Design a protein with these regions (language model features):
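Surface-exposed intrinsically disordered loops and tails
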Residues: 80-84, 527, 568
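Short glycine-aromatic motifs
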Residues: 34-35, 63-66, 125, 240, ...
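Short aromatic-glycine motifs in intrinsically disordered, low-complexity regions
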Residues: 53-63, 516-522, 526-528
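Short beta-strand elements of solenoid repeat domains
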Residues: 206-210, 232-236, 258-262, 284-288, ...
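Secondary-structure capping and domain/repeat boundary segments
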Residues: 2-101
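Structural signature of tandem-repeat unit edges
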Residues: 43-46, 128, 158-173, 186-202, ...
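Predominantly extracellular beta-rich ligand-binding scaffolds that present long acidic/polar faces
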Residues: 490, 515-518, 546-552
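N-terminal capping/linker segments that flank leucine-rich repeat
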Residues: 3-33, 94-184, 193, 505-508, ...
Length: 585
């Protein structure tokens, strides 16, 4: 029989790597930089195909929880049970490499501007608890782990969201950036931070922002020793009545802007625990704390602060503020500082050092309770903006502007807007040589019957929009001393001047592009804001009406030579660029 005729036996060839142990499969656990309790860097066990350990004992390296990987670079994770056995089963010898679990919680995604943990909180959650208890196997996993090693798990227990390490005594590690962590959780009634380690956190910006249903918040578990940013941390937590700040270590904090803004439930606030020696920004820190009746600023070190914009804004129940503890020598921005402090009846500005301040826009806006305001202590040599500085100060009956140095001011729009209690206003002290914006300057000064405008230097002004709007009692306005070569906007300039009889517009309007509703209009709810009593109008040879809706009062206007011109209440036939005085009768 030849070789070709010999029968070929049926042989099955296995390519599987044979086990190095005849009893079963060997799993070698590599410490991968960690050492096992016996001092070795490796530990072996032998198991059979059903997962029964035949020899050896599973151990954890380094006395810490680890995640096992199929490679030493720890890129290919393998899920194991509590005995260290792969959940996928065992079919050959295995080498597993350890990597310590970090227990790191998901955090702020700066590139997308959202907090990944916040996005995990179900809309049904009414409480949040950080714990170390084991997750029930019956509950659905919420993956709250930052690096995928399974160190942090979360689940819902009724309406309570629990976040856990599942290892007794092991805390969850908060990410370094906790911005927006609990942002806008408007249904959450309580947050238990007991098992959250914040020792590595540097930013707590907007951490509890608009947690409107919180009535209490225990800050004791928080380690804030490395935090530099607490901006808007408790913003809008309007139902918290009292907040104990004593657990907070603020030694390294530089930004406290809006920290308590909108905490309208606060009736008291003890600032004693706060170390503010490194803080540079306190803008809006107490804004909207509308139930505070008193605030002791003594504990605050403000020697490095540069921004106090809106610091007391809308603290409407404060009747007085002792500013003596404040060191303001480095402040550049005091805009909105007392805005909306409608309960203030007196305000001593003497303690304020304003030598470096450039912005005092809206500084006293809507301080309706002030009847007098002594400005003599203010140094405004560097100020460039005074927009709406006294707007809405309807209680002021007199205002001495003598102390104000306005030589560098460019914006005084709305500076006296709504000062309805003023019956007289001396503008002589104002140096307006650099001012470009006078819009709304006297708007709503309904107590003025006359106003001497000759002190105003308007050569650089571009906007006179609504400049005298709603000066409802003023009888005569003469702007013949105005240089209006740069003015482009006279929109609604005189609207609401219901008592105005005489108007001198002996100015140059060659660059004005809008006069819409200059002489008034009718509001949506039917209020008539036209200058219906205007009967005397003087114009220059460089004055021209712009557009067709400036709304000069309707009627017949007679020139000095008796020539009659008409206005239909929108536009008129009075000739442009012809100096004359017109009388309506």
């Amino acid at each position: 029989m030849s070789n070709d005729e010999r029968p070929v036996p049926d042989i099955s060839i296995s390519t599987a790597k044979p086990s190095k142990n005849p009893l079963g499969y060997t799993i070698t656990y590599h410490g991968n930089g960690l050492t096992f309790a016996d001092g070795n860097s490796e530990n072996e066990i032998v198991v059979n195909s059903s997962g029964k350990i035949l020899s050896g004992q599973y151990k954890l390296p380094g006395n810490t929880a680890v995640t096992w990987y199929l490679d030493s670079q720890c890129t290919s994770k393998i899920e194991t049970d509590n005995s260290g056995l792969p959940l996928s089963g065992i079919y050959s010898d295995l080498d597993l490499y350890a990597k310590p679990k970090t227990f790191l919680l998901k955090g702020y995604n700066s590139s997308e501007d959202y907090n990944e943990f916040f996005n995990l909180v179900p809309s049904t959650a009414t409480s949040i608890v950080f714990t170390d208890e084991a997750m029930p196997t019956s509950e659905a996993l919420i993956d709250a782990d930052a690096d995928g090693d399974g160190g942090v798990v979360a689940w819902m227990d009724g309406t309570t969201m629990k976040i856990s390490t599942q290892i007794s005594g092991q805390k969850i590690i908060a990410p370094s950036n906790c911005t927006l962590m609990f942002f806008g959780l408007s249904k959450v009634l309580s947050i238990n931070l007991s098992n959250l380690d914040t020792s590595n956190v540097t930013t707590m910006e907007s951490m509890f922002y608009s947690c409107m249903k919180l009535t209490t918040l225990d800050l004791t578990p928080l380690n804030t020793s490395n935090v530099t940013n607490m901006s808007s941390m408790f913003y809008g937590c309007r139902n918290i009545i009292n907040l104990n700040l004593s657990p907070l270590n603020t030694n390294n904090v530089t930004d406290m802007s809006e920290m308590f803004s909108g905490c309208s439930g606060f009736t008291t606030l003890d600032l004693t625990p706060l170390n503010t020696s490194k803080v540079t920004d306190m803008s809006d820190i107490f804004r909207g704390c509308s139930k505070l009746t008193n605030i002791d600023l003594t504990p605050l070190d403000t020697s490095l602060v540069t921004n106090m914009s809106g610091i007391f804004a809308n603290c409407s129940k404060l009747t007085s503020i002792n500013l003596s503890p404040l060191d303001t020598r480095n402040i550049t921005d005091m805009s909105y500082m007392f805005s909306g402090c409608s309960g203030l009846t007196n305000l001593d500005l003497t303690p304020l050092n304003t030598s470096n301040v450039t912005n005092i826009g809206q500084m006293f806006s809507s301080c309706k309770g002030l009847t007098t305001l002594d400005l003599s202590s203010l140094n405004t040599q560097k100020v460039t903006s005074m927009d709406y500085m006294f707007s809405g100060c309807s209680g002021l009956t007199n205002l001495d502007l003598t102390p104000l140095d306005t030589s560098k001011v460019t914006n005084i729009s709305g500076i006296f807007a709504g000062c309805s209690g003023l019956t007289n206003l001396d503008l002589t002290p104002l140096n307006t040589q650099n001012v470009t914006n006078m819009s709304y300057m006297f708007s709503g000064c309904s107590g003025l019957t006359a106003l001497d405008l000759t002190p105003l230097d308007t050569k650089n002004v571009t906007s006179m929009r609504d400049m005298f709007s709603d000066c409802s009692e003023i009888i005569k306005i003469d702007i013949s001393t105005f240089n209006t070569l740069k003015v482009s906007d006279m929109y609604e300039m005189l609207s609401g001047c219901k008592s105005l009889i005489s108007l001198n517009l002996n100015v140059d309007t060659s660059n004005v592009t809008t006069m819409t509703d200059m002489f008034g209009y009718t509001t949506y709810d039917g209020e008539d804001k036209h200058c219906n009593k205007l009967t005397l109008l003087s114009v220059s040879d460089k004055f021209s009406f712009v557009g067709s809706n400036y709304n000069l009062p309707a009627g017949t206007w007679y020139a000095s030579d008796g020539t009659a011109y008409t206005s239909n209440g929108k536009s008129c036939t009075i000739p442009n660029n012809k100096a004359d005085t017109y009388t309506r009768r």
